Structure formats: structure tokens, C-alpha cells
């Protein structure tokens, strides 16, 4: 059986790079896309800012402490969407099997490609060059025989990187990979892995599938496969929306129940509007809480009936909130999302669970 040829393209510091491209006076300077006010959050950081430790999702106040000369510019989402479409026009000249993950990254299956190019790495080089010449932007590319390895490869030599992981190199490459670099392993899961003595791919490969499922649920099977260089997921040219959510960053931290309930009502109301606009139907509600110290938790519950209106969503959200201890830990952000559309409903209905799998993008 012939190996697949998968490319993962990741635009480097996309939002910040677009701003520096369009505003030459910002080039070479530490830049953050976002708002500088007290409750602001960094949406993206240029590489100049990253050298000071500034990262996306960091509070603007912390970012300014790390880099006092940091320049803040407001985001221009319509511009970023337009540039993303231009990038995808380049992709489509090589393949129509494109799976976007966000505005700035996508998988491409070039096993069969429109240009008849034999080597996937040559396609990746061509795409990178065209993005640079036509759009004045820089992208990193990872090339391998599955999605997991292609994504890992694209992160390996950023910015402006190009890395290929061949089948005969995969096991050794994965063995040395820090567990934090595995796709789907966020800070919470990484800490749990460390407590289990798992710090790299080699140690993960030594774990049985039964042990990983026992510790992490169904996603443990995915970790088991990843450690062996196995990822059978296809590049899905049409991605089915699997969740819709919304979240509010509060003007000030809150811990009084009445204030939390009022804010929960506002978030639930906005969520219902989005569900109705998109005609989305799901039966799992997830509550996301971010505390004043930026730690966060999620709580989820699945119902037999679809969650389509405020009368169903708000009582369930309040029930989820009872699982959160916030009186001593003021809340900074509240989010709600609905997932599990129609036939994808999990068999464990009505069962409380803590979500630890960190792929979710809250429908963004």
C-alpha cells in the first residue's frame, strides 16, 4: 500500500505578520494584536515580542510587564479572513483535499496532486515560495505520511520552517518528542502524563492501550497510536461543524453567585442566538470557566433531548456551575458550548465528566 503524502501548512505569527506587512513602520518591532487595557488579552504576538516571552492568550498587562515597549494594534478579522482566502487559492492549485484548522493553518493531501509533482516536499517548497512572493508572508510546512506527524513537523523549525518526517524516521523522531509536543496534549493532560512518569514519546509507547484508556478515556487510544506513528484520520475537505460556543471575558473578576448567574444568563442567551442562526442541534453542553489566575476548567453533561433553546440550556448550565468552586477563586471568563450533533451523541447520556481532551476550538 502506498503511503499518503500529507502537508501541514502553518502561517507564522499570522495576524501579527499581516499587520507588519501592511504597516512597514511596525516591522522589526515587538507587536501584539489585541487591546492594551487592563482586561485585554493578546490575540497574537510577533516573533520580536515572543523573544520577551509574550504569547497569545496572555493578559495584556502581563505582556506589557514582560515587554514594556510592546506595541498593541487592534485586530482586523475581515482582513485576516481575506488573506486566508488568498492562501487557500494557492493551495487549490495543487490539491482540493484541504482541511482548514483555522485561518492560519491547514492540512493538504497531495498524494494525488494537480501538478503531477512526485515529491510532497517539492509541493511544500513551492507553496511556501508562492506565499512569500505573492503575499509577502512566511509559512512553515511539515511533510509526512499522516496528519499527526505532518503537524508535528511544521512546528519543528519555525519560523519559515520545512521539515519532512519519513516513515523510516518516525519511530525514532517520536521517541524523542516531549509529551507536551503531542497533538492534543495541553497543560492539564501534560501534568497528568508527568505524574504517570510519561515525559516523552518513548515512555508513552511503553504504555498499554488499556492503561491509557483507563487514565484518559477514549482519547487514550489516539495517544497509543500516535506513539507508534499511526494516524489513520483522512484529510477532510469538508469539515462538519461539531460545536458552537461563545464566551465572555468579564470587565472585572466576579465570585458572588448572583453576579455569576447573571453573566451565565447573558452567555447562554448569546449561545442560543448562534445556535439558531446556524441551525445547529446538539445535546452536550460544556461550561468553561477561566479564573483570575488564568487557570481554567470545563464541565460537560449530555442530555437525551437536543439543546436548542434557553429553557433547556440555562438550567443545565446552572447545574454544571454547581460543580465549580469559585467563591475563593474569582472568575475572569465564562463560556458555554453545545456539541455532539444528532447521530454523534455519546452513549453515556446524563453522566458527569471532566473534559480533558484539549482539541476543542469552541466553534471558532
From Swiss-Prot:
User: What are the site positions for Substrate discrimination?
Assistant: 15
* UniProt-annotated location(s): Cytoplasm
Write down the required cofactor(s).
Mg(2+)
CC per GO annotation: cytosol
Instruction: Provide this UniProt record's keywords sorted from A to Z.
Output: Cytoplasm, DNA damage, DNA repair, DNA replication, DNA-binding, DNA-directed DNA polymerase, Magnesium, Metal-binding, Mutator protein, Nucleotidyltransferase, Transferase
Q: Which reaction does it catalyse?
A: DNA(n) + a 2'-deoxyribonucleoside 5'-triphosphate = DNA(n+1) + diphosphate
Q: Where is the UmuC domain?
A: 6-186
Any GO BP annotation: error-prone translesion synthesis
The answer to keyword Cell membrane applying to this record is no
Main location, first listed in the record: cytoplasm
Q: Enumerate the InterPro entries for this protein.
A: DNA/RNA_pol_sf, DNA_pol_Y-fam_lit_finger_sf, DNA_pol_Y-fam_little_finger, DNA_polymerase-Y, DNApol_IV, PolY_HhH_motif, Rev_trsase/Diguanyl_cyclase, UmuC
Pfam families xrefs = IMS (PF00817), IMS_C (PF11799), IMS_HHH (PF11798)
Residues the entry annotates as binding Mg(2+): 10, 104
Q: Which catalytic residues are annotated?
A: 105
Q: What does this protein do?
A: Poorly processive, error-prone DNA polymerase involved in untargeted mutagenesis. Copies undamaged DNA at stalled replication forks, which arise in vivo from mismatched or misaligned primer ends. These misaligned primers can be extended by PolIV. Exhibits no 3'-5' exonuclease (proofreading) activity. May be involved in translesional synthesis, in conjunction with the beta clamp from PolIII.
Q: What is this protein called?
A: DNA polymerase IV
Q: Which organism is it from?
A: Bacteroides fragilis (strain YCH46)
Gene name in the database record: dinB
Amino acid at each position: 500500500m502506498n503511503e499518503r503524502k500529507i502537508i501541514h501548512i502553518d502561517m507564522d505569527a499570522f495576524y501579527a505578520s499581516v499587520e507588519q506587512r501592511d504597516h512597514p513602520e511596525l516591522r522589526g518591532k515587538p507587536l501584539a494584536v489585541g487591546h492594551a487595557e487592563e482586561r485585554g488579552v493578546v490575540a497574537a504576538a510577533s516573533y520580536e515580542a515572543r523573544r520577551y516571552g509574550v504569547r497569545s492568550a496572555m493578559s495584556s498587562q502581563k505582556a506589557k510587564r514582560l515587554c514594556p515597549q510592546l506595541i498593541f494594534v487592534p485586530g482586523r478579522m475581515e482582513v485576516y479572513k481575506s488573506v486566508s482566502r488568498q492562501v487557500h487559492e494557492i493551495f487549490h492549485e495543487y490539491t482540493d483535499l484541504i482541511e482548514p484548522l483555522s485561518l492560519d493553518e491547514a492540512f493538504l493531501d497531495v498524494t494525488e496532486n494537480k501538478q503531477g509533482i512526485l515529491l510532497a516536499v517539492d509541493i511544500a517548497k513551492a507553496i511556501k515560495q508562492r506565499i512569500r512572493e505573492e503575499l509577502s508572508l512566511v509559512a512553515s510546512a511539515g511533510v509526512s505520511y499522516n496528519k499527526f506527524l505532518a503537524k508535528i513537523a511544521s512546528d519543528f523549525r519555525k519560523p519559515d520552517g520545512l521539515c519532512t518526517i519519513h516513515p523510516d524516521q518516525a519511530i525514532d523522531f517520536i521517541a524523542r518528542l516531549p509529551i507536551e509536543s503531542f497533538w492534543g496534549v495541553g497543560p492539564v493532560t501534560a501534568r497528568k502524563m508527568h505524574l504517570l512518569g510519561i515525559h516523552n514519546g518513548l515512555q508513552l509507547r511503553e504504555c498499554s492501550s488499556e492503561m491509557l484508556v483507563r487514565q484518559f478515556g477514549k482519547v487514550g487510544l489516539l495517544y497509543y497510536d500516535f506513539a507508534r506513528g499511526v494516524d489513520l484520520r483522512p484529510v477532510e475537505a469538508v469539515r462538519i461543524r461539531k460545536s458552537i460556543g461563545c464566551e465572555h471575558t468579564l470587565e472585572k473578576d466576579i465570585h458572588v453567585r448572583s453576579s455569576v448567574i447573571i453573566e451565565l444568563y447573558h452567555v447562554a442567551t448569546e449561545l442560543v442566538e448562534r445556535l439558531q442562526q446556524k441551525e445547529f442541534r446538539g445535546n452536550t453542553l460544556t461550561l468553561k470557566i477561566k479564573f483570575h489566575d488564568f487557570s481554567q476548567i470545563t464541565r460537560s453533561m449530555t442530555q437525551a433531548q437536543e439543546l436548542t433553546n434557553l429553557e433547556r440550556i440555562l438550567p443545565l448550565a446552572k447545574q454544571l456551575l454547581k460543580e465549580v468552586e469559585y467563591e475563593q477563586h474569582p472568575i475572569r471568563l465564562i463560556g458555554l458550548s453545545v456539541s455532539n450533533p444528532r447521530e454523534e451523541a455519546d452513549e453515556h447520556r446524563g453522566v458527569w465528566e471532566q473534559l480533558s481532551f484539549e482539541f476543542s476550538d469552541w466553534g471558532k
